[in-house]
Swiss-Prot record:
PANTHER family: PHOSPHO-2-DEHYDRO-3-DEOXYHEPTONATE ALDOLASE (PTHR21057). Signal peptide: none annotated. Belongs to the KdsA family. This is 2-dehydro-3-deoxyphosphooctonate aldolase. Pfam families: DAHP_synth_1. Its main location: cytoplasm. It catalyses: D-arabinose 5-phosphate + phosphoenolpyruvate + H2O = 3-deoxy-alpha-D-manno-2-octulosonate-8-phosphate + phosphate. Keywords: Cytoplasm, Lipopolysaccharide biosynthesis, Transferase. It is found in: Cytoplasm. The lineage of its organism: Bacteria, Pseudomonadati, Pseudomonadota, Betaproteobacteria, Burkholderiales.
Length: 282
């Protein structure tokens, strides 16, 4: 198993205690970012869970041109700096264009390659050249084994500090399912890279013809428990103080007030699964 080191001494690997990549979908305001991060830090400190704060500064792939995208690059980096100063946590955020990579890398500790852009070679090279840890979102339209080709692009560009993230696979039109066998396929096909699970976006459910995604947050705990029972390197999760008022993906977001009991269950499962001796079946 390959272990990836994240600033502040966090190690991310499939056989180590899981890392939480948690936060809000998009930066709505400085106040919301700070309040949300404060609760994440309180809960993860209490439960002993390594933690990375996540949010987007620009949701560049919204279905409607009228949908909220975020504060933009400059204001987004300012808010991230404030979060880091206040809480001392690592930051993960997504990059959509090659020219953004070097700028975002000055603030963020982990750069995320969005699922819809995962095969864009120029973006891959720009991200690789930053030398930062990279979180690669698996496109909904790719098989798990195809992630090996994306990982190889990064390695050829000089960066092997990679994490793989599954966020579900297309199942017909406007629906996603999670292939539980695919996590192991991704790890083995990439030489043991850490694999994490984005439970929030796996819960998305499109309204045919609608301009915004629906979601199934009522099934979030069941899906997260199932995936984390496989022994994964981390969980990618979004929570919001009031999901009904969230400016993006509220229907898939966990109510922030339920974060502690939710993560307590995930940690119990992770601790149990990783206490087992490896079982190799021929």
């Amino acid at each position: 198993m390959q272990s990836i080191q994240i600033p502040t001494g966090i190690h991310c690997a499939n056989n180590l205690p899981f890392v939480l990549f948690g936060g809000i979908n998009v930066l709505e305001s400085e106040d919301l970012a700070l309040r949300s991060c404060a609760e994440y830090v309180r809960v993860t400190d209490k439960l002993g869970i390594p933690y990375v704060f996540k949010a987007s500064f620009d949701k560049a792939n919204r279905s409607s041109i009228h949908s909220y995208r975020g504060p933009g690059l400059d204001e987004g980096m300012r808010i991230f700096e404030k979060v880091k100063q206040e809480f001392g946590v690592p930051i993960i955020t997504d990059v959509h264009e090659p020219w953004q990579a070097a700028i975002v890398a000055q603030t963020a500790d982990i750069l995320q390659l969005p699922a819809f852009l995962a095969r864009q070679t120029d973006l891959v090279i720009a991200l690789a050249k930053t030398g930062k840890v990279i979180n690669i979102k698996k496109p909904q339209f790719l098989s798990p084994s195809q992630m090996a080709h994306i990982a190889e692009k990064f390695r050829e560009a000089g960066n092997d500090q990679l994490i793989l993230c599954d966020r579900g696979s297309c199942f017909g039109y406007d629906n996603l399912v999670v292939d539980m066998l695919g996590f192991d396929v991704m790890t083995k096909s990439t030489g043991g890279l850490p694999v994490i699970f984005d439970v929030t976006h796996a819960l998305q459910q499109r309204d045919p013809g609608g301009a915004a995604s629906g979601g199934r947050r009522q099934q979030s705990a069941q899906l997260a428990r199932s995936a984390m029972a496989l022994g994964l390197a981390g969980l990618f999760l979004e929570a919001h103080p009031d999901p009904a008022k969230a400016l993006c993906d509220g229907p898939s977001a966990l109510p922030l007030a339920q974060l502690e009991p939710y993560l307590a269950q995930i940690k119990a499962i992770d601790d149990l699964v990783k206490s087992f001796d490896p079982l190799h079946i021929d």
